[in-house]
């Protein structure tokens, strides 16, 4: 059995973070991972998102039909289950198609037999998060009769996840490169690329103008949104917030925009587009994510904090409508002296989304007031593909 080694006699020994990354890569490619807890219990786990009907059958046969489906608390709640630790649902009598419906269908048949999840399931779910997969797990406890089938699989001790998580909050991000880039309407900027965290993803800081780093620096912490930032989606206000945020940084004499690789509130682009499908049938953005097993906001701001510290910034004016973001940055040691609203546009397509952010995520926007103060004769700039757009003033108080 491929048991993890925690002492490294040579300079290229594995670390907890590297073992977590390898486990995430294995799940993403549709292979099982073995988890070991403090009592040496072994569980084989696979991510349903990367399974096929064939691999499901192979897994079931290998574990002697002792496998179960683990659903997160968010998805369990959708199914009407009171399961604050998530729910394990036995699969011995369920087909692959039935399993998929139970994990993802909007109105599935509710399971009658289940037990609460435990630390193994929480660990497996965390690995799927690292892999940007949907958090539904097919797993089974192993015995000496069944573990031989998984002899070549990646093994991960649960303590590795704890160690990696603890290290993520203290490990500095490496500054990889920086260079000037001229931007339309903004003049010369500087793009600074950092690398760090689990999966060693590249994150970008954009320095606008010449801010005084000894004072409270204007900062926009912006999570990537492919559909809104790049393609101008009308379903959200992300693209507007990006562009208006950059313009505000310039107007304030300079600042920093942190562009974080956290698509879909940290769930990934595939999950985001899947959630759009649920929104098309009437669910709001938070309930749509819950259908897939996600909480209201899976984003983490450790990377943002590390980047600010690397730039020598500890005091900021935060451009955001989200008080929770202020709280998280303050909890990490960043002094947020002021929150400045970032106002975008309301369209017929994104008004429900914005109201949901206010009513369910605590964002600070008076949407009705903003609509009332923006009524004026329509001009050609206020239409997009024939759709009327309600412009919100780019300045003012939210």
Curated annotation (Swiss-Prot):
Query: Which cofactor(s) are needed, names only?
Result: Zn(2+)
> Which parts of the sequence bind GTP?
220-224, 241, 263-265, 285, 320, 325
What InterPro entries is this protein classified in? GTP_cyclohydro_II, RibA, RibA-like_sf
Renumbered to this chain, region (Unknown) spans 1-172
The answer to whether the entry has keyword Magnesium is no
Q: What residue spans carry the region label Disordered?
A: 375-398
Positions with a binding annotation for Zn(2+): 225, 236, 238
Gene Ontology BP term (one): riboflavin biosynthetic process
Against Pfam families, the record matches this protein to:
GTP_cyclohydro2
**GO cellular component entries:** cytosol
Kindly state which reaction or reactions the protein catalyses: GTP + 4 H2O = 2,5-diamino-6-hydroxy-4-(5-phosphoribosylamino)-pyrimidine + formate + 2 phosphate + 3 H(+)
Tell me how the cofactor is bound. Answer: Binds 1 zinc ion per subunit.
Top-rank taxon, per record: Bacteria
Q: Report the EC code(s) recorded for this entry.
A: 3.5.4.25
> Single GO molecular-function term?
zinc ion binding
> Which keywords does this Swiss-Prot/TrEMBL entry list?
GTP-binding, Hydrolase, Metal-binding, Nucleotide-binding, Riboflavin biosynthesis, Zinc
Region GTP cyclohydrolase II, as annotated, extends over 173-398
What enzyme class is recorded for this protein? Answer: hydrolase
**Active-site residues (renumbered):** 297, 299
Establish whether keyword Phosphoprotein is in the entry.
no
Pathway connected to this protein: Cofactor biosynthesis; riboflavin biosynthesis; 5-amino-6-(D-ribitylamino)uracil from GTP: step 1/4
Q: Function of this protein?
A: Catalyzes the conversion of GTP to 2,5-diamino-6-ribosylamino-4(3H)-pyrimidinone 5'-phosphate (DARP), formate and pyrophosphate.
Question: Which NCBIfam families does this UniProt record tie to the protein?
Answer: PRK00393.1, PRK08815.1
Family label: In the C-terminal section; belongs to the GTP cyclohydrolase II family.
The identity of this protein, by name, is: GTP cyclohydrolase-2
Q: Taxonomic lineage per UniProt?
A: Bacteria, Pseudomonadati, Pseudomonadota, Gammaproteobacteria, Lysobacterales
Q: Gene encoding it? A: ribA
């Amino acid at each position: 059995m491929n048991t993890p080694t925690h002492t490294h006699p040579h300079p290229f020994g594995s670390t907890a973070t590297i073992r977590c990354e390898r486990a995430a890569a294995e799940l993403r490619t549709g292979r099982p991972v073995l988890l070991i807890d403090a009592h040496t219990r072994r569980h084989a786990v696979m991510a349903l998102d990367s399974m096929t009907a064939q691999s499901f059958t192979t897994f079931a046969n290998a574990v002697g039909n002792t496998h179960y489906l683990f659903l997160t608390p968010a998805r369990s709640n959708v199914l009407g289950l009171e399961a604050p630790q998530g729910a394990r649902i036995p699969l011995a009598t369920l087909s692959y198609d039935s399993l998929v419906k139970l994990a993802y269908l909007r109105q599935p048949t509710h399971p009658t037999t289940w037990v609460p999840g435990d630390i193994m399931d929480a660990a497996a779910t965390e690995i799927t998060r690292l892999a940007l997969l949907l958090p539904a797990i097919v797993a089974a406890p192993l015995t000496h009769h069944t573990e031989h089938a998984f002899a070549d699989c990646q093994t991960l001790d649960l303590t590795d996840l704890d160690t990696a998580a603890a290290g993520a909050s203290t490990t500095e991000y490496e500054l990889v490169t920086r260079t000037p880039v001229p931007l339309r309407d903004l003049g010369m900027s500087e793009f600074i690329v950092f690398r760090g965290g689990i999966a060693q993803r590249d994150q970008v800081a954009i320095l606008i103008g010449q801010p005084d780093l000894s004072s409270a620096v204007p900062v926009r912490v912006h999570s990537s949104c492919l559909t809104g930032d790049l393609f101008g989606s009308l379903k959200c206000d992300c693209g507007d917030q990006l562009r208006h945020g950059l313009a505000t940084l310039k107007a304030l004499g300079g600042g920093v925009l942190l562009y974080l690789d956290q698509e879909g509130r940290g769930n990934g682009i595939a999950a985001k587009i899947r959630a759009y499908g649920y929104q098309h049938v009437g669910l709001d953005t938070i309930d749509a994510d819950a259908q897939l097993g996600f909480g209201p906001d899976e984003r983490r701001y450790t990377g943002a904090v590390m980047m600010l510290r690397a730039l020598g910034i500890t005091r900021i004016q935060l451009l955001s409508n989200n008080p929770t973001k202020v709280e998280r940055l303050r909890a990490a040691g960043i002094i947020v002296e002021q929150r400045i609203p970032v106002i975008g546009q309301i369209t017929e397509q994104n008004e429900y989304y914005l109201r949901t952010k206010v009513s369910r995520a605590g964002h600070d926007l008076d949407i009705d007031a903003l609509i009332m103060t923006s009524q004026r004769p329509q001009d050609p700039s206020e239409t997009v593909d024939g759709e009327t757009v309600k412009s919100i003033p780019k300045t003012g108080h939210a």
